[in-house]
């Protein structure tokens, strides 16, 4: 359901808050490493719902309905997706939408990536595009959802407002997502949040949370003091005042609305799109979103309030008591970052507070220049460089031999589920008839040596055959690794040395700088598309560690992970959408030297412990090296 007002409608989380006893469309989604919820296909969602009806605490084998998802299993009890060949776990959620929305009609909107493949939009974006399409809007601005893209329906294209690059998009019909009727458990009600765990500690979330708490307290105080009186309907807002091209040189003040109806954030107009100007009846141009919808807030906050922004000089002082909110991209050619400006501005304006948006400091990505004579080896770490060449294909290891090496045969298995095929251990494997293997009988059951978890031998053979086939095995239940796990990282070079500068939070220590360099090349047999070219964007990549005992320990383990080809892999970039490119492989690095504005820098008190845990999950630890 969309918010009222003219022009492009933008939903909040796909829906508002419908009654609990109406029909809803169910969409299952998984959380990627950039904290974006990505929808499973309708076919997969139907499969998950069918399993859910039979056993709400069971597991879902996604490979049974989608051959590309063979390594993946969803644990319905913990609400996590587990990748069997790498051990990667990601939160999943069960989201709900109106049956008349895009997923209820089986409509999918997709954009074309650099490799010519079509990638589906996130579900909230898909619904937003479909709403605008049904209302016959000629264009749509996605800035309110945090994306700097314009959608043009006449040319069926998407344009990046900053780079002006265009991509094709398409609308196709697919299977409608499953429909459900009945009450929704509290853990799955609108709007479905992120995974239940530790709250996010990034600067933006801390700012929003503190702002929300402050505004709620002030608003409660105002409500206690203010007399109750009937609210008069707000007058239609006048058009925004003209601003000089390129935007104000300094800060931007957003004054509180005269009513509690809502607030809008106006910024300097940017260069308009190349498409024809919108006809009468389309919403007025918002300077923060060229040729697009006004930046929305939440619920009915889509209309601009009576307030206007006032540009002030960069040297003008901020009035006492007005909080300064750092905003990214607040410059002459870029918009106010909608995720930050919209959220905090609405919270403060709704509470009757003025808001001053200031320029955010730029991240310090690199240290000051360092001469060659100042670069020193890292104490206790031999050498300054490691190179990896093309994978030397070892003599092919028979999958049955690998599985039998780590398994002990169980003559009388318990009447429990095999968590790979979800059949009972006392019956034949679910891969009987799917995997042809004469040497392994489908009813054979084995127990892994260290952890003791039991599976059908045929199921483990199938799991191993779908992985990297490097002679190692990973328990799907506890993720214990048997053997030495290796990855699919392409050839490259890793350098490491000391530089005479300190990281924030480590004032008394020098810094370990790691430089990764991987050139463009051709994919090998272990990669997604053998024989096809892969790209390597952003290399050389510079990463930083403190030169203390724990930092050097992390470096030694990163060297081991590099030699086992676990640092990078070839896949699809979640930031650019480019396929067949080199991407990070679940081991986080700090690439911001002198600040932590992007979340990839220092200070970060928990980073070293977190990366040690990530390395352990990949089978790289000092204990495993000694074993």
Curated annotation (Swiss-Prot):
A zinc finger (RING-type) spans 418-479. It comes from the Eukaryota. InterPro entries: Deltex_C, Deltex_C_sf, Deltex_fam, WWE-dom_subgr, WWE_dom, WWE_dom_sf, Znf_RING, Znf_RING/FYVE/PHD. GO terms for molecular function: Notch binding; SH3 domain binding; transferase activity; ubiquitin protein ligase binding; zinc ion binding. Residues 296-314 have a biased composition (Polar residues). The keyword Nucleus applies. Keywords: Cytoplasm, Metal-binding, Notch signaling pathway, Nucleus, Repeat, SH3-binding, Transferase, Ubl conjugation, Zinc, Zinc-finger. Ubiquitinated; undergoes 'Lys-29'-linked polyubiquitination catalyzed by ITCH. Predominantly expressed in the brain and testis. Weakly expressed in the thymus, spleen and ovary. Predominantly expressed in regions containing post-mitotic differentiating neurons. It is an enzyme of class 2 (transferase). Homodimer. May form a heterodimer with other members of the Deltex family. Interacts with NOTCH1 via its N-terminal region and EIF3F, the interaction is required for NOTCH1 deubiquitination. Interacts with EP300. Forms a heterodimer with BBAP; the heterodimerization leading to an increase of in vitro ubiquitin ligase activity. Interacts with ITCH. This is E3 ubiquitin-protein ligase DTX1. The gene is Dtx1.
């Amino acid at each position: 359901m969309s918010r009222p007002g003219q022009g492009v409608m933008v939903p909040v989380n796909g829906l508002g808050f419908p009654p609990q006893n109406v029909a809803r469309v169910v969409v299952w989604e998984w959380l990627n490493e950039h904290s974006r919820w990505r929808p499973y296909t309708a076919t997969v969602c139907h499969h998950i719902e069918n399993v859910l009806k039979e056993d709400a605490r069971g597991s879902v084998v996604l490979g049974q309905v989608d051959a590309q998802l063979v390594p993946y299993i969803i644990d319905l009890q913990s609400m996590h997706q587990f990748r069997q060949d790498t051990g990667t776990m990601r939160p999943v959620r069960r989201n709900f939408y109106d049956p008349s929305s895009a997923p209820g009609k089986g409509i999918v909107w997709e954009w074309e990536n650099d490799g010519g493949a079509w990638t589906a939009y996130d579900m909230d974006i898909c619904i937003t595009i479909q709403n605008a399409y049904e209302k016959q809007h000629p264009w749509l601005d996605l800035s309110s959802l945090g994306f700097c893209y314009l959608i043009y329906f006449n040319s069926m294209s998407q344009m990046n407002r900053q780079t002006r690059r265009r991509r094709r998009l398409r609308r196709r019909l697919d299977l409608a997502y499953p429909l459900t009727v009945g009450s929704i458990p509290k853990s799955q009600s609108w709007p479905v949040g992120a995974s239940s765990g530790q709250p996010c500690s990034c600067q933006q979330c801390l700012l929003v949370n503190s702002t929300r708490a402050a505004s709620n307290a002030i608003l409660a105080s105002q409500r206690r003091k203010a007399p109750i009186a009937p609210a008069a309907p707000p007058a239609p807002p006048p058009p925004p005042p003209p601003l000089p091209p390129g935007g104000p040189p300094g800060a931007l003040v957003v004054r509180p609305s005269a009513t509690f109806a809502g607030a809008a954030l106006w910024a300097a107009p940017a260069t308009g799109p190349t498409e024809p100007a919108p006809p009468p009846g389309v919403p007025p141009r918002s300077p923060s979103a060229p040729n697009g919808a006004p930046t929305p807030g939440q619920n009915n906050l889509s209309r601009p309030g009576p307030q206007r922004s006032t540009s002030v000089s960069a040297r003008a002082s901020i009035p006492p008591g007005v909080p300064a909110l750092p905003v990214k991209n607040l410059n002459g050619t870029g918009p106010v970052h909608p995720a930050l400006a919209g959220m905090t501005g609405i919270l403060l304006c709704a509470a009757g507070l003025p808001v001053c948006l200031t320029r955010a400091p730029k991240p310090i990505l690199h240290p000051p220049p360092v001469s060659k004579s100042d670069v020193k080896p890292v104490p206790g770490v031999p050498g300054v460089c490691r190179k990896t060449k093309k994978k030397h294909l070892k003599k092919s290891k028979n999958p049955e031999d690998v599985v039998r090496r780590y398994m002990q045969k169980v003559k009388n298995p318990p009447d429990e589920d095999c968590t790979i095929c979800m059949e009972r251990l006392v019956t034949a494997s679910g891969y009987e008839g799917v995997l042809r293997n004469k040497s392994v009988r489908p009813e054979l059951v084995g127990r892994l040596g260290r952890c003791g978890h039991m599976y059908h031998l045929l199921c483990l053979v199938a799991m191993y055959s779908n992985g990297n086939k490097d002679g190692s095995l990973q328990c799907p239940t506890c993720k214990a690794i048997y053997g030495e796990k290796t990855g699919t990282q392409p050839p490259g070079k890793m350098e490491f040395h000391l530089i005479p500068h300190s990281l924030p939070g480590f004032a008394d220590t020098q810094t370990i700088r790691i430089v990764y360099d991987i050139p463009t090349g051709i994919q090998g047999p272990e990669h997604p598309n053998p024989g096809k070219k892969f790209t390597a964007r952003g290399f050389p990549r510079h990463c930083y560690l403190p030169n203390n005992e724990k930092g050097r320990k992390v470096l030694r383990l990163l060297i081991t992970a590099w030699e086992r080809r676990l640092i990078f892999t070839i896949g699809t970039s979640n930031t650019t959408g480019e396929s067949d490119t080199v991407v990070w492989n679940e081991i986080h690095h700090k690439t911001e030297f002198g600040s932590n504005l992007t979340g990839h820098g220092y200070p970060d008190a928990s980073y070293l412990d977190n990366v040690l845990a990530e390395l352990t999950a990949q089978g790289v630890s000092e204990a495993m090296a000694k074993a």
